[in-house]
């Protein structure tokens, strides 16, 4: 859609049509896609699906104004889960991204104002705004900390003691230690 016609298997036609409908209805202006991001402070990296400007749209009785969004695209039948907000808050709070020329740039240069997930199905699509505020960011950082402690956790249990000799065969038993 963005660069012209593309060939795709017939079984994906519904998904392609739904994606094109999303792009058209919200007048999506892609700023970046498949964007490599990183955060050295909290030691993580990832690939954000889409940074795009979206037209205003209705949501829960209000209008979300035109904004720059970080969007995660999902096609799973199961839909969108809370973990998607954690994924996107990590992307949004990254320190850097890799530009088109392979250069490292500050994430804030992208001007992301909102995060969302687009559930693309064969019969349509839904956009879910995501909460990527301080509570979500704090939760994400706790999970990152736990992940990085995994290696240390493996050292909590020492190696098995032994081998043990038959006590009757020992001439002088070792002195007990305190």
Annotated model-derived regions:
Residues 79-83:
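Short alpha-helix boundary/capping segments
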Residues 94-178:
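Metal-dependent nuclease catalytic regions and adjoining charged, substrate-binding loops involved
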Residues 46-58, 62-77, 87-91:
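Conserved catalytic cores of phosphodiester-cleaving nucleases, focusing on short active-site segments
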Residues 38, 75-78, 122-123:
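Short acidic/polar capping segments at secondary-structure boundaries
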Residues 1-45:
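Metal-dependent nuclease catalytic cores that hydrolyze phosphodiester bonds in DNA/RNA
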Residues 38, 51-55, 118-120:
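A generic structural motif
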